[in-house]
Amino acid sequence: MPVPYFHVVFTLPQQIGGLALQNAREIYTILFRAAAETLLTIAADPKRLGAAVGFLAVLHTWGQNLHLHPHLHCVVPGGGISPDGDRWVGCRKQSFFLPVQVLGSRFRNVFLIYLKEAFDQGRLQFHGEMAGLGRPAAFGALCSRARRIKWVVHAKPPFGGPEQVLKYLARYTHRVAISNSRILSIADGKVTFLWKDYADDNKTKTMTLDAVEFIRRFLLHILPAGFVRIRQFGFLANRARREKLALCRALLGAPSAAPRSALRRGRGQKNG
């Protein structure tokens, strides 16, 4: 669609993200649910955008050093459908989507509500060094500490256009924790790889780990069987996507999307 596309990232704080070590399916499901509810609710607020938005979310669980670092990358068209369905409501500023402070506060509150619900319903399991969190008092104290800190939501500058969005999705959606190109050497039971230190002005550094520790970190990022790491919400949700996208294009005065059969034929043809 001929609109700006924004890149919004929801990140779990370390003490909460660590719960995924023993409860990956529950924590990642709550992460999707809380981020989606946050974006949809804040965008629908008449004081903000006042529209029904749609977006695609991709789960990543790693940091550059391969430690557990759960976060969601969301690609969001800059606008949405008016409540009466008669207008496209664009962002008031082409470079600004929604206030990150408001998003972060809402995200924290919604996530912790769903997290406590999961605990109360017995859907969270703790053992080993984390066994103590199975006690209501200890778990409640963890949530109280998490409620007092800032939860980070980044809204990155808009993509250059739909073509850049497609390039981003092609590169980013199927990425794994570390690519072969970052691994410098495997020798003498050790693995040396490149990583970017965001806390030190994004400097590229090298890290050497024992092979067992490298494998342990890599295995942290294998998702539960059948878990879907790419999901669509709002007017991009699967159940109504075709109709909603057709409405969006009509409201924007944009051409209809080419049929999939035509796209497949086009990809199979050679120029000249």
Residue positions per predicted region:
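Beta->alpha loop/short-helix hinge microenvironment recognizer with preference
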Residues: 1-272
